[in-house]
Amino acid sequence: MRIYTLDGKCNLSGVRVKEARLRLGLSQEALAVKLQLLGLQVGQMAVSRIETGKRVVPDFELPLLAEALNVTTDWLLGKENSSEHRE
């Protein structure tokens, strides 16, 4: 399988993941634990690689990231500017 990149990054949402994580005051490890509780088996290193654009974020992971970070998937994808918590 070929992985396509944009400006050397495998995902576009990593910067937003980091922004939301820091806004919530979470460490990468704490975010990994929240994701594990939602059924996504990732560790701190995977979160780091997502944030730096070195890891692909499959479509099934995006809603779980959004839920863990209390944001929308559209915000993670850059389609919304407001990072307000979702209701």
Regions found by a protein language model. Give the residues of each.
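DNA major-groove recognition helix of helix-turn-helix/homeodomain DNA-binding modules
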Residues: 54, 58-75
